[in-house]
Amino acid sequence: MVHFLHPGHTPRNIVPPDAQKDALGCCVVQEEASPYTLVNICLNVLIANLEKLCSERPDGTLCLPEHWSFPQEVAERFLRVMTWQGKLTDRTASIFRGNQMKLKLVNIQKAKISTAAFIKAFCRHKLIELNATAVHADLPVPDIISGLCSNRWIQQNLQCLLLDSTSIPQNSRLLFFSQLTGLRILSVFNVCFHTEDLANVSQLPRLESLDISNTLVTDISALLTCKDRLKSLTMHYLKCLAMTKSQILAVIRELKCLLHLDISDHRQLKSDLAFHLLQQKDILPNVVSLDISGGNCITDEAVELFIRLRPAMQFVGLLATDAGSSDFFTTKQGLRVAGGASMSQISEALSRYRNRSCFVKEALHRLFTETFSMEVTMPAILKLVAIGMRNHPLDLRVQFTASACALNLTRQGLAKGMPVRLLSEVTCLLFKALKNFPHYQQLQKNCLLSLTNSRILVDVPFDRFDAAKFVMRWLCKHENPKMQTMAVSVTSILALQLSPEQTAQLEELFMAVKELLAIVKQKTTENLDDVTFLFTLKALWNLTDGSPAACKHFIENQGLQIFIQVLETFSESAIQSKVLGLLNNIAEVRELSSKLVTEDVLKHINSLLCSREMEVSYFAAGIIAHLTSDRQLWISRDFQRRTLLQDLHATIQNWPSSSCKMTALVTYRSFKTFFPLLGNFSQPEVQLWALWAMYHVCSKNPSKYCKMLVEEEGLQLLCDIQEHSEATPKAQQIAASILDDFRMHFMNYQRPTLCQMPF
């Protein structure tokens, strides 16, 4: 039996995304709210069942059935999804060895495969693009290049190669890119790539785009070799550059074909290269994109003048600089700015710098300030926050700041305008951050705060078991009262969402029950029935529902004595109903019900049976029904048992119809604890209470409880009561009413196998 009432926050005037002002936000809502494509659903099923569908080679790797054939686009998407899900391994990569799939665009980003698996699976295909960024150390960059060069077709036709890895042996020097003569786009970001390698690469005949960010290059003069064909140059955080400013600018000045230049840097380095570049009038005449984020001494005036002299410019990166707040950057048509001066600039920065943790941190810091009093739902921004968290799982500052931004973007009703799938992703990323940083308290607080959001806690899919473990651990930390209240509140709701089996598996359950009882005892001693007290009672009630383990912990920690003290201290019906609800849960556990057959407990229950408050009387009656149904508990108290049964019968006779309303919302996980009561014809009072209770919930929520009657085979018991000669007319009447309601609910879904009864 459970009681589920959770007061929500009073929402502010929330404004949904405006299609004209926030087209991207509307697109995100539509995308996230749309069902997955049929292709993706099929691919997910295929990936989940690879072991069943594939045969095994002698070397232990998998092989698809010979007669299967994948269109190229589907094969490439299949590989992307496998990689995204972390399912691409040496064992599974082998499915790309056969003739069932032909690949041209290969993405193995962050994959954990060996050199041998990579060469066998992918280097036989006619690849034109390969994204091997952030692959595991088992696949070093020299081996990737060597594998690609083993295929003559790839040597001549591979157009795009993206690398990002520090996994190069220390004694490795030259990387032999020169054989890949078809390369147009090359990224060696974060690779042990030297000046000699740059000289090698600069001679590639078709090279147009080059990213040498965070490499070991000390001199970029070799770029003059490809000055007539290089259109895009990215050299973010080129920390080893040993040239003077004038020497660097002299090289850049010669790159007449350059359309895109990125010389952004870490703010802490205080590089003034961008400052000097902005002063040049005879440089980059055709540039359309300039990134100088992180540069020192950058002013609005200098950037504005530079752009006015190059009217074709479409993008400028100004994050972590002193520039970007001028009206020029908002009024210039067609100009996109990645910066921190406005939401649009921050959005552009989060999108463009998603793989650069230094700038993700900066953008998130600005975003937190901008969204502190946010009253407009911004799903596109929340999605960018999620991308930042996903791309930098081990960066504490990214995770912490992102968690704070996520709170700002979803609190006080804003979550209602967010797609459930997006909220689910963010919540799962928060829990991933908790696992990566288990001792960072502020991150834990942010996660707990997010769980207090009723939209997230009730509607959003995430691992409730992990969440319960986290919240219960937090509960036992004796934090400040406000955080304690939140932890108790979340526990009370999560307890409803766990199966009894999951609750029993919680290692933290014993300590949580003990801590909750300590709170109840303290509040009772202080005569303080505040919100924390009420949430704590509810949490204990819900934790013990259907959980013998939790009930046992309750008894072992003097829970009965504490709850008797509660009943003697407080007379409010809201408190009484919660106490009696929990005692109902204990009464349902046969091994523990004897603990309730004491003078103290029975005195209070019998007194509350006559309460004017319907729910209080109802719960007291339930305890009496369960206790008196077991005659073994009353061997020396038979007179008392008969008296209780008489009082129970008289009380039920005075109750209104079973369809009446109660202040508390009564729900059940199962009817199975009622079945022994339904078959107890020797004690009609017990049977009558069970029927009244079942009819009450069936009338309130027929879709749930009529289905439960079928699944748990309770219909036959009701039919038996209708036909049994010892059943009282009142019991037969209620049983008939339940069956009538059942017929009405399922009249369009009649199935004779559900129950041997006439429809």
From Swiss-Prot:
Quick one: which gene encodes this? ZYG11A
| Top-level taxon | Eukaryota
Q: Which family does it belong to?
A: Belongs to the zyg-11 family.
Protein name, as recorded: Protein zyg-11 homolog A
Q: Per the UniProt record, which residue ranges are transmembrane?
A: none
What are the entry keywords?
Leucine-rich repeat, Repeat, Ubl conjugation pathway
Any Pfam family the entry gives: ZER1-like_2nd
InterPro entries xrefs: ARM-like, ARM-type_fold, LRR_dom_sf, ZER1-like_C, Zyg-11_UBL_adapter
Purpose: Probably acts as a target recruitment subunit in an E3 ubiquitin ligase complex ZYGA-CUL2-elongin BC.
The species this protein was found in: Homo sapiens
Record SUPFAM superfamilies: ARM repeat, RNI-like
Repeat (LRR) positions are 204-227, 235-260, 490-513
| CC per GO annotation | Cul2-RING ubiquitin ligase complex
